[in-house]
C-alpha cells in the first residue's frame, strides 16, 4: 500500500479471520486422525488414562484455529472458570489450553508447564471424580511435543516433563530419533533418553500405539 492510501475497511476483518482460522496456518499431516487414533488405542486399555492439552506461547485465538482444522476442542483454559459437567459429558480431541496470553509467562518458563499441571488436576477431578495431590501428578507420564529446542525441549525438561522434539527436517541429529528406537514403555524410553525427536505426529502415534495406517 502507498503511504497516503487509505486502509480498506474490509482488510482488518479479513486479517483477523485469516489468523484466527486454518487459513493462516499449516497443520501436520494426519493431525486429527493421529490424535483420534491415540485416544482409541488408549481407551482400549482399561488401566490407562489420556489427557491431551496445548501449551503455547500464543493468544486466545488458538482454540478457534484448532477447531477450524477439524479438532473437537474443549472450552477449558487456564484461568477461565469452567463447568465440570462439560468434561464429564463429552469427549474432546484437545482437553485443555495453557496459553501464555492467560498464564502470563512464556515457554521455557516452567510456570506455564506448572499451569498445565493444574489443568490436569482439574480434569482428573472432573472426569474421574478423584482429588489429586502433587505426588499423584508425579505418577503421570507427562510428555510435551514441540518444535523448538530452547523453548520446548529445555523448558519441558526443566519443568519435569518428558520432551519430544518435532523435527520435521531432521536437523537435530544430536537427539535420539524415536523412529530408530524399538517400541517400549514411556518410562523405559525416558530412562534411557533425556529427550527424543520425531519426524511427524503420525510417526509419534505409530510408535506409541503400533497403529496400522494402511488399514485406515
Residue ranges and their predicted role:
Residues 32, 36, 41, 53-216:
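Asp-based, Mg2+/Mn2+-dependent phosphohydrolase catalytic module
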Residues 13-25:
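Surface-exposed cleft-lining segments at the edges of enzyme active sites
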Residues 23-27, 104-107:
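Acidic-and-aromatic substrate-binding clefts and catalytic sites of carbohydrate-active enzymes
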Residues 23-26, 33-44, 49:
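Fungal eukaryote-biased detector of long internal structured cores
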Residues 1-16:
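A metal-dependent, Asp-based hydrolase signature
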Amino acid at each position: 500500500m502507498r503511504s497516503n492510501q487509505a486502509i480498506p475497511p474490509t482488510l482488518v476483518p479479513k486479517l483477523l479471520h485469516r489468523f484466527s482460522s486454518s487459513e493462516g496456518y499449516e497443520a501436520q499431516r494426519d493431525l486429527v486422525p493421529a490424535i483420534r487414533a491415540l485416544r482409541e488405542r488408549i481407551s482400549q486399555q482399561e488401566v490407562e488414562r489420556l489427557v491431551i492439552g496445548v501449551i503455547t506461547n500464543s493468544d486466545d485465538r488458538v482454540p478457534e484455529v484448532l477447531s477450524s482444522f477439524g479438532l473437537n476442542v474443549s472450552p477449558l483454559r487456564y484461568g477461565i472458570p469452567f463447568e465440570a459437567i462439560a468434561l464429564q459429558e463429552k469427549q474432546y480431541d484437545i482437553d485443555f489450553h495453557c496459553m501464555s496470553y492467560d498464564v502470563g509467562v512464556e515457554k521455557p518458563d516452567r510456570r506455564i508447564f506448572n499451569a498445565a499441571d493444574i489443568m490436569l488436576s482439574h480434569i482428573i477431578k472432573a472426569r474421574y471424580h478423584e482429588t489429586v495431590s502433587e505426588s499423584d501428578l508425579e505418577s503421570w507420564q507427562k510428555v510435551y511435543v514441540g518444535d523448538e529446542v530452547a523453548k520446548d525441549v529445555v523448558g519441558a525438561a526443566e519443568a519435569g516433563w518428558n520432551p519430544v522434539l518435532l523435527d520435521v527436517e531432521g536437523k537435530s541429529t544430536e537427539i535420539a530419533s524415536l523412529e530408530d528406537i524399538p517400541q517400549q514403555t514411556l518410562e523405559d524410553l525416558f530412562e534411557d533418553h533425556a529427550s527424543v525427536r520425531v519426524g511427524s505426529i503420525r510417526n509419534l502415534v505409530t510408535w506409541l500405539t503400533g497403529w496400522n495406517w494402511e488399514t485406515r
